[in-house]
Every structure is written in structure tokens, then in C-alpha cells.
Amino acid sequence: MSGVGAITLDGKATRDEIFVDLKERVAALTEQGRTPGLGTVLVGDDPGSQAYVRGKHSDCAKVGINSIRRDLPADISQAELDATIDELNANPECTGYIVQLPLPKHLDENAALERIDPGKDADGLHPTNLGRLVLNEPAPLPCTPRGIVHLLRRYEVEIAGAHVVVIGRGVTVGRPLGLLLTRRSENATVTLCHTATRHLPQFTREADIIVAAAGVPHMVTAEMVRPGAAVIDVGVSRDDNGKLVGDVAPDVWEVAGHVSPNPGGVGPLTRAFLLTNVVERAEALARG
């Protein structure tokens, strides 16, 4: 549906620009003998999780980052998972890493995430780093919110002074995005809505920018969007036919000024900023 009226916020092209920059920075680190390494911890054989992890390592190869994979069987104990996390925390080759979610039900996700060394938290979702974001202290930033801000800037969508309506209160997007957008460097005004918000269209029609991250198929429709507004589609869910769809309905393209496609919008940037967090930490370690 792109090209009907709205300008496409192209996440793939923007990711490619970031990768060109990262490749140069990784080459400079490698010359100093400090090649960054990204680790992944994958438990079990969920096809979606396997695909995500494969994608992350393929991205690493494109920019010259070393891959460190820890693939574990689905029936491991919490103690065995903890031991793997401790090993990566201590491993000097591993600059940063992620524990791929969801974990099997018998494992404690929050305990696993809290065990990650906050300095090696490539996702930017460790409680310490989310706390630093609240305090406006330097820390690895959550990848999806950072990707959203970068994508808006790349296409010169005005953020300072803008009213942004975020739909979704999850820890990976909705909550931290509000914190990023209200920093002095962004200066947006944020309204945080969710699936239980009453009269949601009243909020969205007032918005300069809408970020849909609720995981409800096509919940944002054309009549909810002010003409010319920017609409970012982060939601991922399946429709009745099992097809992956976003939170933004196709008719929004006819009304909005900018729309991020889904797939091909924010997703590629989430992966790009995962690598950026790792490269930035390698550079900080190199500076001493």
C-alpha cells in the first residue's frame, strides 16, 4: 500500500546506512585488536526465536562483529542457564549479549535478565539500565525505542514540541519510548495509551506522531489519524489466517504524512541498534 499518499519511513535503507557506519567503526576497533563480540543465549528450538538469532549473527557478519552463540536445550535447569550467563559475563571476547525471549515456562525470565552484566546488556533492557534511562544517566538504550527516534529523525519528522501518542505499555517499546522522547534532546510531549484506554481515537486524532505497539491487528485506522501525521507501526501479531500483520490498517497510508511499513520499518533498526550498543561499548572500553 505504500506510495498511496504517505512517505514511507524505510527501515531497511536506514539500517543499511547504519551498517556502513558500523563497519568502519568495527574495522577501526579490529585494527587495535579489539574486535567486538555479540553473544546470544537461545534456549530450546522455537522457530521464531531461532530465526531472530540467525538474523542477529548474519548482521554481525555484515559489519565484522564476532558471533558468540550459546544454544541450549529446552529442558535445561535455571542453574544451567545461570552458569551460561555467568560465563558470558566473564568472557572477555563477549562485548555484549542477549538472552533470546521467550524462555521456556519453567525458567525465570526476570531472574535471567537481571543476572546479565548491565555493561554487557546489548538489548538495553536490564533493570539497572532502564533505571539509568529514568535518571538520564548514560547506559545502553533499548533498541526499538532508539530505532523509532532515529527513523523519525532520518526522515526529518519534527520531534521537538510534537505530541506523540504511544499505544502499548510493554517494557520493550511503550514504557521506555516515553522516557526517550521526553529527554531534553528530543523534547516531545508523550501520551501513553494502551488496549484499555477509553476513547482512544480522541487521543490519536490530536497526535503529530502515533506509535502503535499494542500487538492488535490493524487497530489504528484512517479515521483515527490526523491528516499529515506520522504513524509508526511496531505491533506484530497474526490475523485469522495466521498471516503476520501490524497494528496499522492499510487505509492509514491515504491520510498520514509518513508511515513505517511492517515488516520493513522499525524491525531492521531494532537489530541495527543492538549492534550499535555493542560497538559503542567496545569503543568505550578501547578509550579506557
UniProtKB/Swiss-Prot annotation:
GO CC annotations on file: cytosol
Q: Which chain positions lie within coiled-coil regions? A: none
Q: Which reaction does it catalyse?
A: (6R)-5,10-methylene-5,6,7,8-tetrahydrofolate + NADP(+) = (6R)-5,10-methenyltetrahydrofolate + NADPH; (6R)-5,10-methenyltetrahydrofolate + H2O = (6R)-10-formyltetrahydrofolate + H(+)
Enzyme Commission number(s): 1.5.1.5, 3.5.4.9
- UniProtKB keywords: Amino-acid biosynthesis, Histidine biosynthesis, Hydrolase, Methionine biosynthesis, Multifunctional enzyme, NADP, One-carbon metabolism, Oxidoreductase, Purine biosynthesis
What are the protein's GO molecular function terms?
methenyltetrahydrofolate cyclohydrolase activity; methylenetetrahydrofolate dehydrogenase (NADP+) activity
What Pfam families does its record include? THF_DHG_CYH (PF00763), THF_DHG_CYH_C (PF02882)
Q: Does the keyword Membrane apply?
A: no
The alphabetized list of GO BP terms reads: L-histidine biosynthetic process; methionine biosynthetic process; purine nucleotide biosynthetic process; tetrahydrofolate interconversion
Pathway(s) where this gene product acts: One-carbon metabolism; tetrahydrofolate interconversion
Give binding positions for NADP(+): 168-170, 195, 236
User: Cross-referenced InterPro entries, in alphabetical order?
Assistant: Aminoacid_DH-like_N_sf, NAD(P)-bd_dom_sf, THF_DH/CycHdrlase, THF_DH/CycHdrlase_cat_dom, THF_DH/CycHdrlase_NAD-bd_dom
Q: Which domain of life is it from?
A: Bacteria
Oligomeric and partner information: Homodimer.
Q: Which NCBIfam families match?
A: PRK14193.1
Write out the similarity annotation.
Belongs to the tetrahydrofolate dehydrogenase/cyclohydrolase family.
Q: What does the UniProt function comment say about this protein? A: Catalyzes the oxidation of 5,10-methylenetetrahydrofolate to 5,10-methenyltetrahydrofolate and then the hydrolysis of 5,10-methenyltetrahydrofolate to 10-formyltetrahydrofolate.
Protein name stated in the entry: Bifunctional protein FolD
